[in-house]
């Protein structure tokens, strides 16, 4: 069955575990070394923790989920750019809660190349930060439906560009 817009809704804090697991699995080649200090279980736990905390860039506040039989089968994080100073502060605070002070410093050091890869003019940009679909639900248009949903949100926000970072091994 194809993913319809009726099956996509805003993410909730109660979706944190499902979404964290989906994102950690989708980004597994990068997740363990970058987010879990080499440990995939720790990376998943940290993704879940970051997703659960309100207000940051990795928060459920900035995500939508695809639902099938009352289960989260896909997640997409998306938001307009530029990011407010308040949102950046909340992101940093969330990271400190999940990683601690030293761990947050290490995380942002590891992510420095991603930040520098973004376009400098973000005045009318929109950004897709994460997209993950459960393995058993792939091939049915769920990822495409989530991307279309985010694209429509970008249009409503008046964005002129939409940015997406992908990993070389995304499938």
Explain the meaning of each model-derived region.
Residues 124-126, 154-167:
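Conserved GNAT acetyl-CoA-binding A-motif
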Residues 28-51, 96-102:
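Conserved GNAT-fold acetyl-CoA-binding loop/helix
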Residues 82-125:
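Conserved acyl-donor/pantetheine-binding loop and adjacent beta-alpha core of acyl/acetyltransferases
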Residues 135, 139-152, 156:
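Conserved acetyl-CoA-binding loop-helix of GNAT-fold acetyltransferases
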Residues 40-63, 67-68, 115-117:
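Active-site rim helix/loop that mediates acceptor-substrate recognition in acyltransferases
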Residues 65, 71-80, 127, 132:
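Conserved beta-strand in the GNAT
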Residues 7-21, 30-33, 81:
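A short beta-loop-alpha structural element at the N-terminal edge
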Residues 129-138, 164-171:
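Conserved beta-strand-loop-alpha-helix junction that forms the acyl-donor binding cleft
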């Amino acid at each position: 069955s194809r993913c319809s817009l009726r099956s996509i809704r805003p993410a909730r804090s109660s979706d944190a575990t499902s979404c964290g697991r989906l994102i950690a699995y989708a980004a597994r080649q990068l997740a363990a070394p970058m987010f879990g200090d080499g440990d995939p279980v720790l990376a998943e736990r940290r993704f879940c923790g970051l997703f659960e905390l309100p207000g940051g860039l990795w928060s459920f506040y900035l995500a939508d989920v695809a639902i099938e039989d009352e289960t989260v089968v896909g997640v997409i994080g998306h938001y307009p750019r530029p990011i407010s100073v308040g949102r950046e502060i909340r992101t940093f605070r969330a990271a400190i809660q999940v990683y601690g002070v030293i761990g947050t410093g290490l995380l942002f050091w590891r992510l420095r190349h991603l930040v520098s890869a973004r376009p400098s003019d973000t005045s009318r940009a929109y950004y897709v930060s994460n997209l993950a679909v459960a393995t058993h639900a792939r091939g049915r248009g769920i990822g495409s439906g989530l991307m279309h949903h985010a694209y429509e949100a970008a249009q409503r926000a008046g964005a002129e560009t939409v940015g997406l970072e992908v990993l070389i091994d995304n499938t």
